[in-house]
Amino acid sequence: MTDKPIKTLTVEQAAEEAADLRPQLLEWGKQYYEADAPSVEDDVYDRVYARLVALETAFPEIVTPDSPTQRVGGSSRSDLPKVTHDIPMLSLGDVFSLDELTEFDERLRGNVDTPFDYNCELKIDGLAISLRYENGKFVQGSTRGNGQIGEDITANLKTIKSIPQTLSRPLTIEVRGECYMPKAAFLALNERREAAGQAPFANPRNAAAGSLRQLDTRVTADRQLATFMYNVADYEPLTTRTQSGLLDELAELGFTTNATYRVAHDMADVAAYIETYQAQRTELAYGIDGIVIKANDLPLQRSLGATVKVPRWAIAYKFPPEEVQTRVLDIEWTIGRTGVVTPTAIMEPVALAGSTVARASLHNPDYLIAKDIRIGDTVLLHKAGDIIPEISQYVAAKRPAEAKAYVIPTTCPSCGAELVHLDDEVALRCINPRCPAQLAEGMNHFASRNAMNIAGLGPQIVAQLFDRNLVQDVADLYRLTTDQLLTLDKFGEKSAQNLLTAIDNSRNNSLERLLFGLGIRHVGAKAARSLAAAFGDMASLMAADSEQISAIDTVGGIIADSVVTYFANTQVHELVAKLQAVGVNMTYTSGTPATNSTSEFTGKRVVLTGKLQELTRPQATEWLEQHGATVTGSVSKKTDLLIAGEAAGSKLAKAQSLDVPVWNEAQLQAAMDETK
């Protein structure tokens, strides 16, 4: 792509440049839409695409039928049933500056005789979907595909809790929106994938797309996908005739909509909305990559119509990527509790998207080799999906002459055992079951706040316990003595007694904390709680088969298979027996208060949002569930109470729009104090 002003080009020069850009864009689009594995950053694709649009606009005679500008999205997977969109699912035109946005506004108002407002909405970074209802019943769901033909993913969409199976009114209607993966779910998924030796997803959008297009619905069910619906194929079944009203009516029907929208009377209002959410984007629980500006009047939308690819009544303002330069000081290899060995770039600290970054995962050896990152390199750094620090590339002009290609280690940096590639894994793995680093990481997890919550038992102390051969597994913690702890660095009588007290107190934890602490693959804190509540004690769970476990609400087949595999291991049986012998509780006790008494929370659906100051989110959740509440992750008309901490965002706005009662943390604390 050249930087020559288009007005200086001849037709021949424009045609030649466009011919160079088209195959590159088509290949990038195939990787993005079909393989869910983008090879370039969105900003790079957007800029090249914008250049091609500008060329073809200035020289219409060079447009070809196979140009990416004449297509919507990508093609569909060959192994999923096809769905024809009677009304095409169009993509949006892009602008990258307020000047371009003003040009769009002037052009649109020049074609409309009467004044009109815009509706501004967040551009969710996910996968476009369409949901078809007949007489209020969900009958089919599909992806956008190429805009004309998508994939039938009905079975997978039925696993997503935010998609209603029955509407509040018996409408026949097609509703469109975005399926996305929340940031927290994305981080947890990538942690599980890396621990399993699988390549991590590049960003939440690709994670959502890969999860939604699975042939196994159990995979989709385990991925914690969510949706925001924002459009309909035909608005006639609705009572509203505005875009803002459409969002409200969809919420009344039972859909999850994004309550952060704002009606804008002019470009000043639009610019203010952009400024607000460009500043807040990193604080949101989901990824956004821009703002969508739509004519608010639905009949006006219909009269303006669309080009072959984009509607004339809407535009997407794309946020510029925040990218900084820093220098790689070292490449460090760490061993996780499952043996996966991960390279991490240690960098000169640099401010990026609201935080100081000094480390960035290089994921696995293949990634490191492909990026060709070397010690001493100056690199471009950004946050993938506004979350994870990620190196885009090295700066070739600044590479030191002495920088050499990095040599991948062949032995474990902890125990010296040979590192291996297991089948179908991109990760290097240490398979020594007695590797000190793996055992230490497992113990750190066991002691963590959401697991056994052993205050004072941090990584440095765990490392010393292993170095001095005081522990071999987590059961040994319960046999430690004061004299043994006094041999550790910086330990006195008081600190030793405090740690022993914390360890002793953890014996009485409810079963779900122990299950989570054991580090069973795919079993997070929520799944552990469901398992413990359903089976009641460890022996019953260990005796259960996959069918019995997967029958539990919120526990899918993948988790069930993982639990059965874990407890089939004789070493696990020995560990559980050791834990039981030292007095660790093996029964579910968290549910006792809720079953024996009632409270103002009994039977209530409660949502937590924002940052709590005195409590942790798990502590608040556990207390609420003990007192009869069901804690959910999204606000709807069925929500009975929202508890809002600091920096509460879209959930608070939606709760207020639905007249859901809102408490602050102090009110929750007061309720907790009353029950003591």
From Swiss-Prot:
Which sites bind NAD(+)? D42, D43, V44, Y45, D46, S91, L92, E121, R144, E178, K294, K318
Q: Which Pfam families does the annotation name?
A: BRCT, DNA_ligase_aden, DNA_ligase_OB, DNA_ligase_ZBD, HHH_2, HHH_5
Any single Gene Ontology cellular-component annotation = cytosol
Identify the residues that bind Zn(2+).
Answer: C412, C415, C430, C435
| Swiss-Prot/TrEMBL catalytic activity | NAD(+) + (deoxyribonucleotide)n-3'-hydroxyl + 5'-phospho-(deoxyribonucleotide)m = (deoxyribonucleotide)n+m + AMP + beta-nicotinamide D-nucleotide
Q: Does the keyword Membrane apply?
A: no
According to its UniProt record, which cofactors does this protein need?
Mg(2+); Mn(2+)
Active site positions: K123 (n6-amp-lysine intermediate)
GO biological process entries: DNA repair; DNA replication
Q: What GO terms are given for molecular function?
A: DNA ligase (NAD+) activity; metal ion binding
Could you tell me the EC number(s) of this protein? 6.5.1.2
Family listed: Belongs to the NAD-dependent DNA ligase family. LigA subfamily.
What is the purpose of this protein? DNA ligase that catalyzes the formation of phosphodiester linkages between 5'-phosphoryl and 3'-hydroxyl groups in double-stranded DNA using NAD as a coenzyme and as the energy source for the reaction. It is essential for DNA replication and repair of damaged DNA.
Q: What is this protein called?
A: DNA ligase
State the gene name recorded for this protein: ligA
